[in-house]
């Protein structure tokens, strides 16, 4: 199985933690969940100046400015799509939705076929990407 985490900082933490500190926190949270998903790690920090995507090891953001209001992350045990295309968090093309997911969708091929008939284009073979588009639909 994979591991997922979410962090919603208090108002004070938002003021005290810049993107550099949050990227370090994301790295620590990913490390704590490494036993749940040894194949890949990723996270997304939602700040007032946009979304910062992170990988492991966390890299410093281009801008250290911005207050983070939400941090989502995932450690991955690759089962269905073993390629890097299955890296999470997944983001919808319009940027409206972000998904971290732990589990397996057994009927994802049928769901994917239905969504493709409705014009959705997938970048991976991962069941998690199917879930993202199904929820956005």
For the regions a language model picked out, list residue spans one by one.
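N-terminus-centric sequence/structural signature that marks the extreme N-terminus
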Residues: 1-137
């Amino acid at each position: 199985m994979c591991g997922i985490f979410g962090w919603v900082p208090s108002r004070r933490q938002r003021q005290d933690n810049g993107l550099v500190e949050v990227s370090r926190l994301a790295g620590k949270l990913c490390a704590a969940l490494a036993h749940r998903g040894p194949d890949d790690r990723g996270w997304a920090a939602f700040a007032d100046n946009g979304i910062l995507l992170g990988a492991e090891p966390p890299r410093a953001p281009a801008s250290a400015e911005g207050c983070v209001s939400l941090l989502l992350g995932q450690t991955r045990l690759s089962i269905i799509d073993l390629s890097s295309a299955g890296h999470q968090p997944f983001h919808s093309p319009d940027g409206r939705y972000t998904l971290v997911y732990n589990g397996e969708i057994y009927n994802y091929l049928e769901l994917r076929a239905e969504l493709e008939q409705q014009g959705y284009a997938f970048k991976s073979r991962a069941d998690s990407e199917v879930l993202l588009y199904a929820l956005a639909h």
